[in-house]
Curated annotation (Swiss-Prot):
It catalyses: di-trans,octa-cis-undecaprenyl diphospho-N-acetyl-alpha-D-muramoyl-L-alanyl-D-glutamyl-meso-2,6-diaminopimeloyl-D-alanyl-D-alanine + UDP-N-acetyl-alpha-D-glucosamine = di-trans,octa-cis-undecaprenyl diphospho-[N-acetyl-alpha-D-glucosaminyl-(1->4)]-N-acetyl-alpha-D-muramoyl-L-alanyl-D-glutamyl-meso-2,6-diaminopimeloyl-D-alanyl-D-alanine + UDP + H(+). UDP-N-acetyl-alpha-D-glucosamine binds at T12, G13, G14, N122, R164, S191, I245, Q290. It comes from the Bacteria. The lineage of its organism: Bacteria, Pseudomonadati, Thermodesulfobacteriota, Desulfovibrionia, Desulfovibrionales. It is a peripheral membrane protein. GO terms for cellular component: plasma membrane. It comes from Lawsonia intracellularis (strain PHE/MN1-00). This is UDP-N-acetylglucosamine--N-acetylmuramyl-(pentapeptide) pyrophosphoryl-undecaprenol N-acetylglucosamine transferase. InterPro entries: GlcNAc_MurG, Glyco_trans_28_C, GlycoTrans_28_N. SUPFAM superfamilies: UDP-Glycosyltransferase/glycogen phosphorylase. Its EC number is 2.4.1.227. GO terms for molecular function: UDP-N-acetyl-D-glucosamine:N-acetylmuramoyl-L-alanyl-D-glutamyl-meso-2,6-diaminopimelyl-D-alanyl-D-alanine-diphosphoundecaprenol 4-beta-N-acetylglucosaminlytransferase activity; undecaprenyldiphospho-muramoylpentapeptide beta-N-acetylglucosaminyltransferase activity. The gene is murG. Cell wall formation. Catalyzes the transfer of a GlcNAc subunit on undecaprenyl-pyrophosphoryl-MurNAc-pentapeptide (lipid intermediate I) to form undecaprenyl-pyrophosphoryl-MurNAc-(pentapeptide)GlcNAc (lipid intermediate II). One of its GO terms (biological process) is lipid glycosylation.
Length: 363
């Protein structure tokens, strides 16, 4: 018998990619459908997986100030719509991967007495998952440090943060690059881009190019034109500037050093593929969770952490150049990252979902 599984999340790739990594585990083994925000990027991201998508009229509440009342009203409407979707699709379980988009479907599932599970990617749980943890039948964590936040330990499982199979495959292709002479810098601002990181790199292009550093730069859609113009001033180079990188596995494999934000999925992927990094956490992330995420890689010696408020005082470009000039440190950072990569998370979450469904079937 095929189970019917509803997956719900949205907002950013940091939530959606772990959800899709788990969806990969159920290929041909379950009927899947995806519930997210009709305003987020998730509908497009899910298309390539051929999973039916249902959109809800919800936006985030935190940081919206006077618009929060409107957002809360939309959430109530979304719960009503989510109930109708669940009535139509009749899932055996609803699995949420955080963000405001997951709240309505999981509440609706509880109202309909459908089993639920949630996965938390960050060291510091987001608002939606903190509220939903009381209702969920299972709570999956990316890092054991988060365990103390949840009071009902019997339903909590440490699974790791699911990553895409193409990224997992790179874990086994890891190579010691101490004899390599390449200077490949991968610049990432997350799925939505990062203007601060983009500006740091554009302002430092002259120094980077003079040190023979080749760059692949994901700018985000909204800042692409500006950044592209910055690179164009230097004529033909081997560097690439794109709004979004579709094949992240290939980009990681190409890179020697990564400059990026510190979203939970990025941290998990950096560890899995064994890439040293310079991390500039997004300073306005809820509860500053990106800083807590970054500290994991810093503690094990795999990353350098630079708060965005310090980028004026700290010469980020000089840090990049110094690491490329110190191959021993760069390799040791890569080895430390690779050692702490967890690649079985998607399988663990999938197995826990099956266990929960089996237990409920026996009741």
């Amino acid at each position: 018998m095929k189970y019917r599984i509803a997956i719900t999340t949205g907002g950013t790739g940091g939530h959606v990619y772990p959800a899709l990594a788990v969806a990969e585990q159920f290929h041909d083994k379950a009927d899947l459908f995806f519930i997210g925000s009709q305003y987020g990027p998730e509908a497009e991201m899910v298309k390539t997986f051929n999973i039916p998508f249902y959109g809800l009229p919800v936006r985030g509440v935190l940081g919206r100030k006077w618009k929060a009342f409107s957002a809360l009203y939309s959430m109530i409407k979304a719960i009503v719509k989510a109930r109708k979707i669940l009535q139509k699709c009749m899932p055996d379980i609803v699995v949420g991967f955080g963000s405001y988009a997951s709240f309505a479907p999981l509440v609706a599932a509880k109202l309909k007495r459908i089993p639920t599970a949630i996965h938390e990617q960050n060291v510091r749980p987001g608002l939606a998952n903190r509220m939903l943890a009381r209702l969920a039948d299972r709570v999956f964590l990316s890092v054991p440090d988060t365990l103390h936040i949840f009071t009902k330990k019997s339903k909590v499982r440490y699974t790791g943060n699911p990553i895409r199979q193409s990224i997992v495959d790179l874990h086994y292709k890891f190579e010691d690059t101490k004899n390599s002479s390449t200077r490949h810098l991968l610049v990432l601002g997350g799925s939505l881009g990062a203007i601060a990181i983009n500006s740091i790199v554009v302002d430092g292009l002259s120094r980077l190019f003079s040190n023979r550093i080749v760059i692949r730069h994901q700018t985000g859609v909204h800042d692409w034109e500006r950044v592209k113009e910055g690179y164009a001033l230097y004529g033909r180079t081997n560097s690439q500037v794109t709004p979004f990188i579709d094949d992240m596995a290939e980009a990681y494999q190409w890179s020697d050093l990564v400059l990026c934000r510190a979203g939970a999925t990025t941290i998990a992927e950096l560890a899995a593929v064994g890439k040293p990094s310079i991390l500039i956490p997004f300073p306005y992330a809820t509860h500053d969770h990106q800083t807590y995420n970054a500290q994991f890689l810093v503690r094990v010696g795999a990353a350098v952490l630079i708060p965005e408020k310090n980028v004026v005082e700290v010469d980020v470009i000089e840090k990049i150049i110094a690491l490329f000039n110190d191959r021993v440190t760069l390799v040791n950072m890569a080895l430390a990252a690779h050692k702490h990569g967890r690649i079985d998370a998607a399988t663990c979450v999938a197995n826990e979902i099956i266990d929960l469904l089996s237990a409920n079937a026996m009741k």
